[in-house]
A protein has these predicted regions:
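Substrate-binding clefts and catalytic carboxylate motifs of secreted carbohydrate-active enzymes
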Residues: 2-118
Length: 118
């Protein structure tokens, strides 16, 4: 599935509140490239942008929890110069530096209204 495929997904659910968790993509802080380049901050933003389009079409959503907030040590992640023993799906790098996706998520939280499920 491509990130833009999420734009057209339709959800039909009963009147129940929904929390969406563990979504997003990996990116190494400071690694830049095209919106389709794996591990680039731009690719992480692109994935989130399309996921937000889908999420905004689900009126019952009451909360969003990204895959992880901050990159963390994960011994099985061994791609040299990209993972170096870290899970890189965070909005913040392991040293606390904000990735581009942090600002996108911050904006999404500010714009999203919360109320009763319809």
């Amino acid at each position: 599935m491509r990130p833009e495929d999420a734009d057209n997904i339709k959800w039909t659910l009963p009147q129940k509140p929904i929390l969406i968790s563990e979504f997003g993509a990996e990116a190494k802080q400071g690694n830049h490239g095209s919106k389709n380049q794996r591990w680039a901050e731009e690719q992480q933003v692109n994935v989130y942008e399309h996921q937000f389009v889908m999420i905004n079409n689900i009126p019952q959503v009451r909360g969003l929890i990204p895959w992880i907030l901050m990159d963390f040590r994960s011994p099985g992640r061994n791609i040299p110069k990209l993972q170096d023993g870290f899970n890189r799906k965070g909005l913040l790098a392991e040293d606390g530096k904000k990735k581009q996706a942090f600002y996108l998520f911050q904006k999404a939280y500010k714009e999203r209204s919360v109320g009763k499920a319809e």
